[in-house]
């Protein structure tokens, strides 16, 4: 079965789509709550904490909108409308990348400035800060066509760092 046929079969099964949407919403909302808890733990000042909350809300909203652009493609979709939905999805994804990158950058700055956590935590949070800058540069430097390669690499490293920080938070009281 071709990948396009597999995606169409997935989208036609409304029960699976509904379950996937609920799982994604739950997981990413929990992640957002955890990011705010990390911000409190690293002592982000109130003004920056307010900015961080706004960025995380926008990041979540655009993430869910971006997911909906590929989960609910109808039978009447034409090539032109599919291309348009793809362009809108790319724009929404760019907003999500920018807001997420700024949120992680704020966390990084205050975690390193305040010396929060142990050395492993500081290294992981510093990597997140570097990845945030790389994601922004990947969007800004469109002529180099680096967005896909940088995005893929940073996506993997984001995941590893966030899992590492989560494990540290569960296993130690310092992180």
Please place each PLM-identified region on the residue numbering.
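Hydrophobic, aromatic-enriched alpha-helical segments typical of multi-pass transmembrane helices
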Residues: 1-175
